[in-house]
Design a protein with these regions (language model features):
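Phosphopantetheine-dependent thiolation modules in NRPS/PKS and related acyl-activating systems
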Residues: 2-37, 46, 51-79
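Two-component histidine kinase catalytic core, primarily the HATPase_c
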Residues: 41
Length: 79
């Protein structure tokens, strides 16, 4: 799977789960701000992404990650 496809799937899943139109989300957007979520909701999103991609993302790999592109890169590295 390409990084572009991984990024697209991350954006689509976030869009569906948080009921934000997909066209309002971009790879470089801060997901906390763009989705209007808190850290617990972000953790829920990460859990859903792990299930969707059948991976496990260690906490240390996610520290400081707040944009969709970097999140997709971390996921891609585990595929």
């Amino acid at each position: 799977m390409s990084l572009q496809r991984t990024t697209d799937e991350v954006l689509q899943l976030a869009s569906n789960y948080f009921k934000v139109p997909r066209e309002q989300l971009g790879p470089d957007d801060d997901f906390f701000k763009k989705l209007g979520i808190n850290s617990l909701q972000a953790l829920d999103l990460l859990t859903r992404l792990e299930q969707h991609f059948h991976i496990e993302l260690p906490d240390y790999e996610l520290q400081g990650v707040s944009d969709f592109r970097t999140l997709a890169e971390r996921i891609q590295s585990r595929l």
